[in-house]
Structures are given as C-alpha cells and as structure tokens.
C-alpha cells in the first residue's frame, strides 16, 4: 500500500473543491500518511490539504468576465508549477477546471513526467473537441462522471474509467420536501419556489434582477407564494439580499444548503451548471436559465456544438427541462411558463418520470470502479 506518497490535487471552483475534498477524506481515512497539497478552497483545506492557492474565490466564466482576475490566475499557475517542481509528487489529480488544468497537465507531463489522473472531464463533446489530443498526450487516466464520455475516450484510445457521478450519492442523502422545510424553518403548507442564480459573481449580476422581476409577476397571481434563495459561499450575502429589498416579496435567504433548498421547494428556477444537475437528480420540477455577456454569447453560438445547455437535457439528448437562455431569459417568459406549468399537473408528472430515469443512468451501480479505488491503484507501492 502507499506509504508517505505525495499527491497534488488541483480544484479551482467550489464544486470541484467539494468533490475533491470527499476523495481526500476517503484517502486520509485509509492512508493517513499521504502528503496531499495543491490548489482548492475551504473544503479541501478542512480535509487537511496544504493549499498553495485558493481560486474558488474568483469564480468567473466567459471571455470578458475573467479579465480582472488574469494576474491572480497567472500567479497561481506559476506557484503550482514551482510547487510541482519542488515536491515531485507521485500523482497529480486534476479536477475539472480545464482552462487552467489542461495547461498544467502539459507542463507536469512534458517537463516533469508526473503521473496524472483527470477527474471530471472537460466538456470536449460540447466545444474545444481538439483538447482530446492534449489529453491523450498528457493524461494517464481519465475518471469520467458521464457514461457517454467513456465511449468518447475509448474511441480516441485514452485510458478511461466511468466512476459514477458524485452528485448521485450526495442526492441520495438529501431530505424530502417536508424534512427540508422543517430543517430550514420554512412553512409546510405554502407554495415555495427556489431561486438559484449561480455561484459566480457575473451570474449574480445578470440573473438576480430577472429572478426578482419573475418573482414579482408570479406573486401577482399568487400572493401566498414564497421564495427561498440559497447563497453560494463564493458570494457576499448582502449583495444578493440588496436586490430583493423593498420588493414586497416573501423571501428566505439561506447560506449554502442549495440541495436542501431545492428539496424544500415545489419548483426551482436554476442557473445552468452543477446546481441544475443536482435539481434534476432530486427529480424536482424545474426550468434552467442562463444569461452571459454579449461577447461570451456570440462566442458560444459560434464554438459550442451541442443542442442544449442544461446537463440533464444534454444527457437525455432531448429537451426534458425547458431552457431560458440569453434573450429568452426574462421575467415575462419565465413567469408565463411557470404559471402554465402549475396549471397542468401532467407536465410535472412527465418531467419527474424522465428525471428518475436519468438519475438511474448516472448511479455508482453502473460505474466501472470508484474514484478512490482508481486513485489508490495509481499510487506507487513504496513498501513493495
């Protein structure tokens, strides 16, 4: 078994930080002498990882949104390169975050010859498909979370294992609606809509004004309607609350606990991303929103080659959940859809049935192995 092996792990966003921390906890429980360092956030720090940088505080996406933080990202990249050169780890685990991590993989493999596992694949099936050539050259093992990704990598000759989706296990432990409302202090018998604007600063700025106006229109039809807004750890709560002040809306703000908020709701409006898949796995009636800067939108229209943005729709290869994107992402369209949805119980039943099938396809029971087993297999047998 590994003895005092050195592992470096890099997770640049909050969701990756959380998933990586779960892996670290499993590794530390069995191999307490493992030396683990890298880039991450509060979850990896709490799991005992020595952090070189924390990039989860600078959660941005898009062409224009990233510009103010370029110096920070460059410094973090130089710092982790120096750390790899000094530490010479037995294994480098890269978690999602492809713009940063694929550059790091190239350096770590070509310059230092480090063994690399990449967990949570870049979305090469959506855009930048040529990245697969770099992956083939630099990554020793892909650990993918969607079954169809395994086929893509196998066809390209890249070593790959489907390790199940980390959210399935997390969702299995989630509270039901009644328990969720009780734990959050929400009323048991009133209609509640959860509003999830995203975890990036640019998403907050673009989505929350739309969500506030949507909530106001919906409340005109149903004054008893309440809203719950989970606030990501990357966001200043006061900034979110300010948008809702003096709007005559009944809103409960919760720090974190997005899954609990979605479980407690009757319906969810969620920004495209990890939370939208969490909502789908909860089998919760929902719709997906997203609005970016104009330049990012134009670039996406040109480069992205998939029909859908929501992960649940991509996986199903059909529009099982409606998407309100860019110019369609507005209060009038959203409120009209939600009002019609609530007046037609068959829509909810159909959506829930489809989401249940999706959830089963991503379960760990379908996986080749666990991420933990995959990582342990790649660590050296130092005492052998």
From Swiss-Prot:
One of the record's GO molecular function terms: lipid-A-disaccharide synthase activity
Family annotation (Pfam families): LpxB (PF02684)
GO cellular component, one term: membrane
UniProt keyword annotations, A-Z: Glycosyltransferase, Lipid A biosynthesis, Lipid biosynthesis, Lipid metabolism, Transferase
The keyword Transferase appears for this protein: yes
InterPro entries: Glyco_trans_19
Keyword flag Lipid biosynthesis: yes
Involved pathway(s): Bacterial outer membrane biogenesis; LPS lipid A biosynthesis
Top-level class of the enzyme under EC nomenclature: transferase
One annotated GO biological process: lipid A biosynthetic process
Catalytic activity: a lipid X + a UDP-2-N,3-O-bis[(3R)-3-hydroxyacyl]-alpha-D-glucosamine = a lipid A disaccharide + UDP + H(+)
HAMAP family per UniProt: LpxB
NCBIfam families, sorted: lpxB
Role description: Condensation of UDP-2,3-diacylglucosamine and 2,3-diacylglucosamine-1-phosphate to form lipid A disaccharide, a precursor of lipid A, a phosphorylated glycolipid that anchors the lipopolysaccharide to the outer membrane of the cell.
Family label: Belongs to the LpxB family.
Protein known as: Lipid-A-disaccharide synthase 1
């Amino acid at each position: 078994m590994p003895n005092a092996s050195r592992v470096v792990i890099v997770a640049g966003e909050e969701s990756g930080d959380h998933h990586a921390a779960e892996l670290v906890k499993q590794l530390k429980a069995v191999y307490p002498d493992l030396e683990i360092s890298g880039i991450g956030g509060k979850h990896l720090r709490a799991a005992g990882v020595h952090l070189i940088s924390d990039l989860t505080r600078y959660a941005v996406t898009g062409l224009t949104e990233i510009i103010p933080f370029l110096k920070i990202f460059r410094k973090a990249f130089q710092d982790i390169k120096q750390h790899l050169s000094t530490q010479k780890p037995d294994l480098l685990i890269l978690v999602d975050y492809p713009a940063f991590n694929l550059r790091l993989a190239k350096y770590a493999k070509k310059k230092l010859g480090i063994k690399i596992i990449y967990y949570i694949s870049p979305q090469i099936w959506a855009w930048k498909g040529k990245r697969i050539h770099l992956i083939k050259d630099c990554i020793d093992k892909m650990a993918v979370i969607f079954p169809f990704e395994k086929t893509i990598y196998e066809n390209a000759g890249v070593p790959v294992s489907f390790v199940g989706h980390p959210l399935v296990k997390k969702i299995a432990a989630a509270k039901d609606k009644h328990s969720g409302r009780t734990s959050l202090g929400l009323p048991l018998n009133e209609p509640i809509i959860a509003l999830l604007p995203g975890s990036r600063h640019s998403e907050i700025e673009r989505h929350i004004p739309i969500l506030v106006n949507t909530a106001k229109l919906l409340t005109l039809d149903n004054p008893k309607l309440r809203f719950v807004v989970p606030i990501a750890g990357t966001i200043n709560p006061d900034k979110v609350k300010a948008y809702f002040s003096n709007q005559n809306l009944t809103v409960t703000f919760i720090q974190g606990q997005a899954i609990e908020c979605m479980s407690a709701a009757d319906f969810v409006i969620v920004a495209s991303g990890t939370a939208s898949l969490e909502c789908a796995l909860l089998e919760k009636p929902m719709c997906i929103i997203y609005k970016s800067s104009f330049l990012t939108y134009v670039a996406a229209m040109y480069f992205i080659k998939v029909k859908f943005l929501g992960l649940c729709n991509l996986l199903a290869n059909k529009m099982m959940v409606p998407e309100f994107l860019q110019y369609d992402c507005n209060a009038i369209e959203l409120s009209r859809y939600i009002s019609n949805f609530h007046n037609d119980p068959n829509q909810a039943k159909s959506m829930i049935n489809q989401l249940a099938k999706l959830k089963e396809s991503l379960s760990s029971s379908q996986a080749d192995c666990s991420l933990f087993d995959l990582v342990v297999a790649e660590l050296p047998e130092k005492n052998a």
